[in-house]
């Protein structure tokens, strides 16, 4: 409801997200925020419908008055003293594709909605925000966006989505003392040279390194069994090769078998005395299914054999199909997020999202709105408390995430990289243990 039309302009800017009270009127809300009724209706397209009725609890985007926006674009830059943010107010910029043209835009609109919901929650806790949003689509002019006077006054900026836009925005943020939060996957190593960048996404190499470290921490006394799944499209060689090197360096023996091996040959790869940890060299579902079938046969022949599995983030997408097997074979699934729809706080936010935006969150893992909510909560709280000293380390964390934990570590001579790593341990008791590193 709120964003379908409002993000079409290059630089929509909102001064507040307002919850309608019992005796509110459209005129009264406009007067309260110093805007015209037309400006309020333009920011909230549903208000332009013939059958529209203002309802208690409804969420309305409150734009800045047009005359204020014009003045901001034409006046001279403020002095450093006047640019200092007001106490308990954080200026937030969002530079992402905010449109309904394609999947990129639709996903980022949901992420942005999560950011707005976080700002609304924080306001109730005494932390105010000014949110400035720019529709930075794939072919947008980065220079035009950065020329907006409001961009310089941001305390932090979420974005961009596209790799080619990172360097100019990163340079701008470094020049103006702004924290740049890159929320999704990008290519390039700007975080290694720009100390104002917070990179949430973990590269394949970093993910493999963290996964190997967690494996060695949990399974030093186990017997690893690598299963070659004959998948020529797999990208998991980065992890399996790194794990085998570590095992060899520490003198830990392991076996390799193949999905095409006969049942007796497959069984020979397993230890009768130690706990066996099965590692596939692909994350795809068909090969996982075939491996589980072989493990079922193995367990039938050797009921007392100890088996665990060390998987991949993709396995969470197959949870509805294989969850019983995850419990049966004690699957350990590495991930950077934990989505639990039954958790009261998560269920509450999803319910409020449905009420505010008249739609459900996209069926994606992780949920984009929850990602935006968690990241906004984490960074806005941190900057409000620590100002320019905020660096996102565990010692400064003041927020318990709904889905997406964050833990940043300084890259040598560069910015901050998210190093948070989680193992989900599916226990035979049909409970899930969350192990956070």
Across the structure, where does each feature detected by a protein language model lie?
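Extracytosolic ligand-binding ectodomains
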Residues: 10-437
């Amino acid at each position: 409801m709120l964003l379908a039309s409002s993000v079409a302009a290059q630089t929509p800017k909102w001064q507040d997200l307002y919850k309608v009270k019992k005796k509110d009127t459209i005129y009264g809300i406009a007067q309260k925020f110093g805007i015209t009724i037309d400006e309020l209706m333009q920011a909230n397209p549903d208000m332009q419908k013939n059958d529209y009725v203002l309802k208690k609890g409804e969420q309305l985007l409150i734009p800045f008055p047009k005359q204020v926006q014009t003045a901001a674009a034409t006046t001279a830059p403020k002095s450093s003293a006047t640019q200092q943010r007001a106490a308990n107010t954080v200026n937030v910029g969002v530079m992402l594709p905010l449109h309904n043209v394609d999947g990129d835009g639709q996903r980022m609109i949901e992420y942005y909605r999560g950011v707005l919901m976080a700002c609304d929650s924080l306001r109730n806790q005494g932390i105010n925000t000014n949110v400035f949003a720019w529709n930075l689509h794939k072919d947008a002019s980065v220079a035009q966006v950065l020329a907006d006077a409001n961009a310089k006054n941001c305390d932090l900026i979420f974005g961009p989505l596209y790799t080619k836009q990172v360097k100019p925005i990163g340079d701008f943020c470094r020049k103006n003392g702004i924290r740049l939060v890159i929320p999704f996957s990008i290519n390039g190593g700007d975080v290694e040279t720009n100390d104002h960048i917070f990179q949430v996404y973990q590269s394949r190499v970093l993910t493999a390194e963290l996964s190997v470290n967690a494996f060695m921490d949990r399974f030093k006394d186990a017997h690893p069994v690598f299963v070659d799944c004959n998948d020529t499209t797999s990208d998991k060689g980065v992890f399996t090769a790194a794990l085998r090197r570590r095992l060899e360096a520490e003198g830990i023996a392991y076996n390799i078998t193949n999905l095409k091996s006969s049942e007796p040959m497959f069984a020979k790869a397993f230890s009768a005395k130690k706990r066996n940890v099965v590692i596939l060299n692909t994350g795809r579902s068909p090969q996982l299914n075939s491996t589980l079938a072989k493990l079922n046969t193995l367990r039938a022949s050797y009921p007392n054999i100890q088996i665990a599995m060390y998987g991949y983030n993709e396995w969470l997408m197959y949870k509805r199909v294989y969850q019983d097997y995850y419990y049966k074979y004690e699957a350990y699934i590495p991930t950077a997020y934990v989505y639990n729809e039954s958790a009261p706080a998560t269920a509450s936010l999803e319910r409020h999202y449905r009420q505010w935006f008249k739609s459900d969150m996209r069926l994606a893992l992780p949920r984009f709105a929850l990602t935006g909510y968690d990241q906004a909560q984490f960074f806005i709280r941190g900057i409000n408390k620590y100002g320019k000293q905020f660096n996102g380390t565990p010692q400064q964390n003041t927020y318990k995430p709904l889905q997406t934990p964050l833990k940043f570590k300084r890259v040598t001579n560069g910015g901050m990289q998210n190093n948070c790593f989680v193992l989900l341990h599916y226990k035979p008791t049909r409970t899930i243990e969350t192990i956070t590193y």
